């Protein structure tokens, strides 16, 4: 009722933007007649106006005033360079982002293009803008694609990639707009705060950030902190032995209740992702290991056994990790991508290596860590966009203070969401998926099937191979990841079938009929790489990987040098048509010309890709080679478009893209993302979810109610079940999971908030030391505090002065400052506490000046170097130890809940005390090190 009275708050918010949209549209006419030079000149005009701002508040006010003109300029540049004009709703999206909100825009509504508006406007300040995406491929694509608009307007565009060295990173962070992934940004921040020298710092101060797929980064990944770690030696044979022992233990069929152990050696709680030994299990494990106590501090085993049990029960090969080149590589549970170089901490990765009989790598110790929540809160202004944010609106507001605005679609959504089909068993479900795929495939419609793991995608792939349905597989396996963009470029073609794990190709639109421009670039790359790219750097030509009945994966090898007409017909699955002789000859001539210019097989693949990306842009250039590649791309695209445009028409008439979901995800939001793949920009399309009562979601969170339903449904295995009660159970289960994970994220955030305040204090102290700001006065202040603390520790004011232990006090001072060895306790008689502090502080300052004079005589400038060295060394060592102590505290406070104490409050209080203790030790250690420091002089040998 209140909603009807007050109206939709989202609509009310959007209403404020329409007058500005009208203003931008009016400006369009005047701006469209400007020359390229004049359009580019707008950037300098805007910057000159911003120079007048005295502070960031004034700057923001001027940015708001510039917005209509700046957006109109970006729209015109985009038309000229990309051939894409921002719709009115995209302008609204840009305003929402500039204001530091989350813009919910449906799939295919051009979120990537929207980001050019606020990023250009905020880059005018010269303080840098970060555009964040979920993976390296998307960051590179957007920097090349959308970066054209910014470069055309005179801005510098940077890109951060996983394999870049610090020098390249620094250069790219200095650009006006930098494209990067969330993990690269986070790790660079942590590395900067471990730098030994100011020159090693790569990032500058944060200003404005736009996060693409904001829900994936700020919600899904918020449970996992970013950790930089160092190696710790632990006995490797213990991992191996524990892995062997747990294989002899029996899992309990159910969880224990009311403190009574179930039958079995250990119980597994999949919901909490934990494994616990029963009393019988403890006894049996101790017997098998031939030890008396698993918790014996001199020979601890409990940690190894628990991790081995988790590796056995909760970490599944080809779901949570894959084995590649003798290593266990993590698979990201949200994107389905492999994460090389990442490892589970706390000995879990070693337990998995032992389980798989792989070489066990050393265990690691945390050197620095931060959660994404606290990392992104470091930005003074933060914004984000996604196709699905409304379900998490409350969390965005509570955790990040971000409001969510739903942007209307440019065209009406024409997608049909068909009713779910639920089967009793998983086998029946997969047979039904294969059947529907076959049926829709015969209609000529493209199909996208979303699966939740590598294992499931390969199971379905086998079923489709048995039905002789050609298809592409997009999952975390390395041979597929490299072909991700090729697969997605073809996913909208007539009769195409694509199986994707957790929609790894997120961020790439599926265009009905196929993406002719992308396929043209691919064709150029295939032809030129054989003549221009070094053999060792060359990948196999891009060929569809298809299931073959007899041999699993069959990669159809094609010689890139071969004439197109002689190529295997399978290439028609990749490219829409065999090129005409005219275009084919042009490509041969182009290759010969470029070999003369750039050398025979002299380029790396990356260099060739950069040339092709530049040629694909519409940015003006005088480089003849780039222009020649540009003409070739245009010729190929024109021939391909004849087919893709016709296929688009046929596919649209047949009903558009059909999306099949094979399991409800733990979050409704991820289901909506998969559905949103169909029906982009008003296209026709349909979606259907196939589920089984054995699916993880229902099994773990659906509880006993679903078990009862399974028995109640005495129906054939292949008969789909449709029931209101079942649908409600499903939605109830999803809400339960969402709440459960929200609570976990909230807890992670609350606990890391304690660490965050400490981290900020340590990092700002560290940054000040690196910059070398007034180090001497800083060290002297440490010394003064230390002298005060010694007086407080040795003088009891409740006793008469004659009973004060002045000898011990002087002894302690001399431990720290050997230069005060002549100090006598008799000199302190008659002084009160404050006078003692003032006297000793004065003595310490004199001693420090004396120390400096002695050292500077033989080693000029060494004192400042020593101050910097010891301050960094002590801070890093103590912070590292403090992180370990805080981890241990976090584990131990959980038990205090049983004593009616709030674990979080206990953690805050004790953590604060531990931090104060750490800072006291830091000050004392620096003072001690500075006075004890004696530089050695190297003897010059004749």
Curated annotation (Swiss-Prot):
Q: Which UniProt keywords apply?
A: ATP-binding, Cell inner membrane, Cell membrane, Cytoplasm, Membrane, Nucleotide-binding, Protein transport, Thylakoid, Translocase, Translocation, Transport
Q: How does it sit in the membrane?
A: Peripheral membrane protein
> Which residues participate in ATP binding?
90, 108-112, 509
Q: What is its EC number?
A: 7.4.2.8
What InterPro entries does UniProt report for this protein, alphabetically?
A: Helicase_ATP-bd (IPR014001), P-loop_NTPase (IPR027417), SecA (IPR000185), SecA_CS (IPR020937), SecA_DEAD (IPR011115), SecA_motor_DEAD (IPR014018), SecA_preprotein_X-link_dom (IPR011130), SecA_SF2_C (IPR044722)
The catalysed reaction is: ATP + H2O + cellular proteinSide 1 = ADP + phosphate + cellular proteinSide 2
Broad class of enzyme this protein falls into? translocase
Keyword check for ATP-binding, yes or no: yes
Q: Where, subcellularly, is it found?
A: Cell inner membrane; Cellular thylakoid membrane; Cytoplasm
Q: Name one GO biological process term.
A: intracellular protein transmembrane transport
**Function summary:** Part of the Sec protein translocase complex. Interacts with the SecYEG preprotein conducting channel. Has a central role in coupling the hydrolysis of ATP to the transfer of proteins into and across the cell membrane, serving as an ATP-driven molecular motor driving the stepwise translocation of polypeptide chains across the membrane.
Q: Which family does it belong to?
A: Belongs to the SecA family.
Q: What is this protein called?
A: Protein translocase subunit SecA
